[in-house]
Amino acid sequence: MNGSLGVILAGGLATRMGGGDKGVLPLGTSTLLSHVIDRLTPQVDSIALNVNGDGSRFAHLGFPVIADSIDGFAGPLAGVLAGLDWAAEQGVNSIVTAAADTPFFPSDLAARLHREAGGMAHPLVIAATPDPKRGTSRHPTFGLW
């Protein structure tokens, strides 16, 4: 662990799949969200879930549930802002974010992001992968903020 708080971004509307919580979709014997939690937990000091709507539907997971501070489902950056506000309340100045619907991110994502930040006082590093057509594909839901 590296002194970061993890925020799982699960506040989307899932409009392309007709609505609902993508994180609760099954993957094997579990859910997408459970896989993300299992992957992120060893990489951070603690985790919160950024969700919209009735947060009590995630209470059984035992994590703090934080809602966007901006109304109207403003997108994942609103979740990042809510996560940063939550971290500030904990006395921490950075968060590592992961998307609730993308379970197969690196098991050393947080370490990679911190390494790329290189000791920045106010880090901002997002995940990226090589793309033969575009050069680089950025994945801003996975980042160090």
Predicted regions and their residues:
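Nucleotide and nucleotide-moiety/phosphate-recognizing core
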Residues: 1-145
